[in-house]
């Protein structure tokens, strides 16, 4: 029986699960994570109250800048640069993105990327860390509160991370992550307002939790809402969707249907909506000064052909293509 068992394991290892998949499983709650999330959210609500009643304007502006900077570090850095290699970055930009990503407190880049590459390779299956087949709560935040599914662990070992494991910037972050995240995400955001404009430590700390919680939910929303509500202009057979409103609050990450079809595109969206796609503008700026280069994108012809073949008949704004054609003729009559 031994040879059969080994052969079965090899076959099992190389078999890609078919989505949607959510086999019955036991959930083992990680209570330490639950308690951290409870504290963060209660503290953030208190911080929001302080922001409206007691905090200095400098503290509010300071935390807003941290929120925006951390958001760009996740969308441009963890996601488009390191997860999908959609563009390349010179050392100064890599260091900047790594430090700001640490400030967002969303795992080290290497852990973030492994989970995200798993998500793309095994989307909506038991090997997907945030499997949307298990419901919107699970894909949003619940997956972080329980131990990983055995398939996530098993398939995670097969994900190729060789392009990042020898990156000195990411190796440094991984090695010193507990120290760095404590300093960047908690100590500095609390102490800087106290030292520079005499904010109270209580207010500075709790207001800083607001940007931490809101920034986390910004990322979580792509894993959950962008797999539940919206249009599917590129591929109607998959769960990822496109949402203009979600793009507004996620710096351009809401064009998720497009992204799952063309994950290599640094824009994560078609041309024509870049003024909503702040991350694309962020990358374009650093390309202009020479810190970002080799920006990859799908050609308009490639996008049009795929949309015609598998799309749901909507355009990049979520409108029916027939309606879009009528509007175009009104603006540009032949």
Regions found by a protein language model. Give the residues of each.
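Non-catalytic, topology-defining segments of multipass membrane proteins
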Residues: 1-220, 225, 265-334
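Active-site-proximal inter-transmembrane loops
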Residues: 161-169, 232-255, 261-262
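Alpha-helical transmembrane anchor segments
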Residues: 207-245, 249-250
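Conserved active-site loop/cleft motifs that coordinate metal ions or position small ligands
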Residues: 257-259, 294-295
């Amino acid at each position: 029986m031994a040879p059969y068992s080994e052969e079965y394991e090899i076959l099992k290892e190389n078999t890609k699960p078919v989505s949607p998949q959510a086999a019955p499983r036991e959930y083992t709650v990680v209570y330490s994570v639950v308690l951290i999330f409870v504290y963060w959210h209660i503290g953030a609500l208190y911080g929001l109250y302080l922001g409206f009643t007691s905090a200095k304007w400098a503290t509010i502006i300071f935390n807003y800048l941290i929120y925006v900077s951390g958001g760009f570090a996740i969308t441009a850095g963890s996601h488009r640069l390191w997860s999908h290699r959609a563009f390349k970055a010179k050392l100064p930009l890599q260091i900047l993105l790594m430090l700001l990503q640490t400030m967002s407190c969303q795992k080290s880049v290497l852990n973030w990327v492994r989970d995200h590459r798993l998500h793309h390779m095994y989307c909506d299956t038991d090997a997907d860390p945030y499997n949307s087949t298990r419901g919107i709560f699970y894909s949003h935040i619940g997956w972080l509160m329980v131990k990983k599914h055995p398939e996530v662990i098993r398939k995670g070992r097969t994900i190729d991370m060789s392009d990042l494991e020898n990156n000195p910037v990411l190796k440094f972050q991984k090695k010193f992550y507990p120290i760095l995240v404590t300093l960047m995400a908690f100590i500095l955001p609390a102490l800087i307002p106290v030292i520079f404009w005499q904010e109270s430590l209580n207010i500075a700390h709790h207001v800083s939790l607001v940007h931490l919680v809101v920034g986390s939910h910004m990322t979580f929303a792509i894993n959950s809402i962008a797999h539940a509500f919206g249009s599917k202009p590129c591929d109607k057979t998959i769960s990822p969707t496109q949402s203009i409103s979600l793009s507004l609050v996620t710096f351009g990450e809401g064009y998720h249907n497009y992204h799952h079809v063309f994950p290599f595109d640094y824009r994560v969206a078609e041309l024509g909506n870049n003024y909503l796609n702040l991350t694309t503008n962020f990358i374009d700026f650093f390309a202009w000064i020479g810190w970002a280069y080799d920006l990859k994108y799908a050609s308009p012809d490639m996008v049009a052909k795929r949309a015609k073949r598998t799309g749901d008949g909507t355009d990049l704004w979520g409108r029916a293509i027939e309606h879009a054609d009528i509007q175009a003729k009104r603006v540009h009559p032949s």
